[in-house]
């Protein structure tokens, strides 16, 4: 199952709003607020690489997302 960890930098003051929006994104299995360099970590699992890529694209297109760092999991 294609899986990726996504680290997210959100707009200042919009971290919780971003969390609420992204938790309903298709294929998002887990999401956590962080303190430190990144604001969120998201675990995305999909049935196909195409579905994974589509979910990653939706995350990146969120208006409150400034930057993402994606780490695909090799099984």
Can you name each region flagged by the protein language model?
Residues 1-75:
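A compositional/biophysical signature of low hydrophobicity enriched in polar/charged and small residues
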């Amino acid at each position: 199952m294609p899986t990726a960890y996504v680290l997210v930098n959100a707009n200042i003051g919009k971290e919780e709003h971003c969390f609420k929006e992204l938790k309903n994104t298709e294929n998002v299995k887990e999401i956590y607020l962080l303190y430190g360099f990144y604001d969120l970590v998201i675990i995305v699992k999909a049935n196909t690489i195409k579905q994974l890529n589509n979910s990653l694209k939706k995350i990146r297109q969120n208006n409150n997302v400034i930057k993402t760092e994606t780490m695909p999991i090799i099984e």
